[in-house]
């Protein structure tokens, strides 16, 4: 009987979607309890249950199509009573399809959270947390304002200069030396103003831009600013410096806070390390004169994930995604900067 077939289809759909909801709840629990990135991967295999991560929505779609068909019949014979009844039935069918359709939002949310947890644990990132370099806990606004005041590169916005996203971590080089690090996103906003016909300045639009960088604490080098941009730095990096290498001078602009200190520091070996560090990247590398803090600021998105979640319809595909994705620009910067600081 057709009615029995419909009942069976509804039952099968309910069972399939119930399994998906159970898997979603289990994924949330895994994400909250895992201590390491490997814990997440181990919890996903073996799964020992149906691995589906896609809602069954064929029946609601068919119901919506049938409802639309019944509604369109009204244009054939508007006065017919049966056509009018089919119009009401069509609206009811579309409404029922709407309330029974399962959106993918719960799946997308848990996958996004698993991505965040995997990134945090894989790279030891403590998001929105103060670096351990600051022994006394400070309000986020205070310690970020303190860091921005130390370097003359965080005043590029005429309206705002913010760190909407940051994370504290620790880098270890191949000799076992550890560096306290804060990775951040720098967002600044400029306004574009023109004069109207009365000669008054009016704001036309706002321009939003982003840069990304790191602070490295307790570094030995100090009082030097290096940039790949054609610009100058202001106080305290007031003294320009030209090396004996013409190609380096064409590629890098170097400034310092003390000429004698620069003469001691900028030996050929140090200049070569600078050249190697900037071989594949653009940006500013600044060593504060007094605070033993390094700041690198560039255009590469350090929080960029190599592959986003696409067409993940089961637990196996999810595990493969979480196992292989990475932060390529952050890995590259960590490798080159720890090598530079050795």
Regions found by a protein language model. Give the residues of each.
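Juxtamembrane membrane-interface segments of multi-pass membrane proteins
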Residues: 16, 32-42, 108-127
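Hydrophobic alpha-helical transmembrane segments
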Residues: 58-62, 74-92
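GHKL/Histidine-kinase-like ATPase module
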Residues: 191-200
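Polar-ligand-bearing catalytic/cofactor-coordination segments
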Residues: 187-189
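Transmembrane alpha-helices and immediately adjacent membrane-cytoplasm interface residues
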Residues: 87-112
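Transmembrane alpha-helical segments and their cytosolic interface motifs
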Residues: 50-71
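Cytosolic juxtamembrane N-terminal segments of multi-pass membrane proteins
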Residues: 2-55
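Charged, low-complexity intrinsically disordered regions
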Residues: 117-124, 129-184, 201-342
């Amino acid at each position: 009987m057709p009615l029995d077939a419909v009942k069976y289809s509804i039952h099968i759909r309910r069972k399939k979607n119930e399994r998906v909801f159970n898997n979603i709840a289990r994924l949330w629990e895994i994400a909250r309890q895992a201590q390491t990135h490997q814990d997440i991967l181990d919890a996903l295999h073996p799964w020992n249950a149906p691995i589906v991560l896609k809602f069954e929505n064929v029946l609601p779609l068919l119901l919506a199509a049938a409802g639309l068909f019944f509604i369109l019949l009204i244009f054939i014979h508007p006065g017919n009573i049966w056509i009018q009844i089919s119009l009401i039935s069509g609206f009811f069918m579309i409404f029922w399809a709407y309330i029974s359709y399962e959106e993918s939002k719960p799946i997308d949310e848990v996958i996004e959270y698993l991505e965040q947890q995997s990134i945090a644990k894989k790279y030891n990132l403590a998001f929105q947390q103060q670096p351990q370099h600051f022994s006394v806990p400070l309000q986020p606004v205070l310690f970020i304002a303190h860091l921005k005041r130390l370097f003359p590169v965080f005043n590029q916005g005429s309206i705002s200069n913010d760190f909407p996203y940051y994370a504290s971590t620790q880098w270890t080089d191949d000799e076992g030396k550890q560096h306290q690090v804060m990775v951040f996103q720098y967002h600044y906003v400029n306004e574009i103003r023109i004069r109207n016909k009365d000669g008054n300045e009016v704001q036309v639009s706002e321009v939003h831009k982003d840069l990304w960088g790191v602070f490295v604490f307790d570094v030995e080098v100090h009082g030097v600013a290096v940039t790949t941009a054609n610009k100058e730095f202001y106080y305290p990096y007031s003294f320009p410096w030209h090396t004996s290498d013409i190609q380096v001078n064409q590629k890098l602009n170097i400034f310092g806070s003390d000429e004698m200190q620069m003469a001691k520091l900028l030996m050929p070996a140090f200049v070569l390390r600078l050249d190697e560090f900037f071989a594949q990247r653009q940006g500013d590398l600044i060593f504060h004169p007094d605070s033993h803090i390094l700041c690198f600021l560039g255009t590469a998105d350090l929080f960029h994930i190599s592959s986003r979640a696409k067409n993940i319809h089961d637990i196996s595909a999810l595990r493969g995604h979480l196992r292989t994705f990475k932060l390529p620009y952050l890995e590259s910067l960590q490798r080159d900067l720890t090598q530079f600081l050795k």
